[in-house]
Amino acid sequence: MKKQRNLRSMAAQAVEQVVEQGQSLSNILPPLQQKVSDKDKALLQELCFGVLRTLSQLDWLINKLMARPMTGKQRTVHYLIMVGLYQLLYTRIPPHAALAETVEGAIAIKRPQLKGLINGVLRQFQRQQEELLAEFNTSDARYLHPSWLLKRLQKAYPEQWQSIVEANNQRPPMWLRVNRTHHSRDSWLALLDEAGMKGFPHADYPDAVRLETPAPVHALPGFEDGWVTVQDASAQGCMTWLAPQNGEHILDLCAAPGGKTTHILEVAPEAQVVAVDIDEQRLSRVHDNLKRLGMKATVKQGDGRYPSQWCGEQQFDRILLDAPCSATGVIRRHPDIKWLRRDRDIPELAQLQSEILDAIWPHLKSGGTLVYATCSVLPEENSLQIKAFLQRTADAELCETGTPEQPGKQNLPGAEEGDGFFYAKLIKK
């Protein structure tokens, strides 16, 4: 039996590691969840994700409720108060229980002398909640995005930025990819219905299903047997443009965790696929995904800027480059992105993308297809990146996705749609 732990203090420390130390929640959370009971795993995740989603609001409230911020060794208390405020604002946890557990969290972080302070701040919020929220709703913090990102979205999407921000602040839908080598989408939807769950097919992507209500993967018909994979609809859209064929040599570059690698093999089971990623640790997930689905691919660790180091002079019929990016299209799925990214990262990422594109292009056969994809919504990484590439690359031609003046297809995040995603299909003349 797992030792009873204070979830509020665990959430506070996790959020602190994200915001203060720049660590990714997807690295921090799984080891923490191993320490708690199954029923507490979901609540711990809810507290971490929720606080990061609404961090601007919680920070704003603390600045109103406290004369001066907590600093130094007491900084964790700042995040513990955030966890308390989040529960009072956004969960169904009874207020007395939320307060009691949050105050007890002070003992777990070895700050028992601050229990009274935490209790006082949270009770003050309860008394002043109405007027504080009215004031908050007229502040810039209400958009729940850092100011640098808000400015970029407003500049890029003067008519749509508010709907993008709104989508980013929602909980994400759960999208699945039906493995067409096992079932048609309709036959798997019938199995889902028999299991007491409801799913909706995507209008454009033939394998994509949105669950009416997110569910644990072990509850999905045939998940362990590889009948279905969790993958956002927009990520599945890459196959529409790549159109892999049996017998072809295909490179999936920046492949981890392997969702697109396995999708290529579902669409073209007899393709020869090479999956490459710079991160050796994340490549283990590519192996895991291939194993669960019973598929084979050549998996290599390598830097996309130096392809000759891992493929020599080899050329490919098709290349999928899912480029490293700001991930500004998947904020609703990874709210820590808002606080991990900085404005200065964008030109650095654009430079990296440009270097990878230039390096990998010679490894595409004449007449071959390269699909450039990102989960970003920022033009510097997307349409402007491809426009510049087309201008400097004489044998590259845009195909089916946009115009040379406005190249690529940009998906924006939507409540019943996929994440923010960009695609450009390029043909080598």
Swiss-Prot record:
The active site is at C375 (nucleophile). Coiled coil: none annotated. One of its GO terms (cellular component) is cytosol. Belongs to the class I-like SAM-binding methyltransferase superfamily. RsmB/NOP family. PANTHER family: NOL1_NOP2_SUN FAMILY PROTEIN _ ANTITERMINATION NUSB DOMAIN-CONTAINING PROTEIN, NOP2 YEAST -RELATED NOL1/NOP2/FMU SUN DOMAIN-CONTAINING. Specifically methylates the cytosine at position 967 (m5C967) of 16S rRNA. NCBIfam families: PRK10901.1, PRK14902.1, rsmB. This is Ribosomal RNA small subunit methyltransferase B.
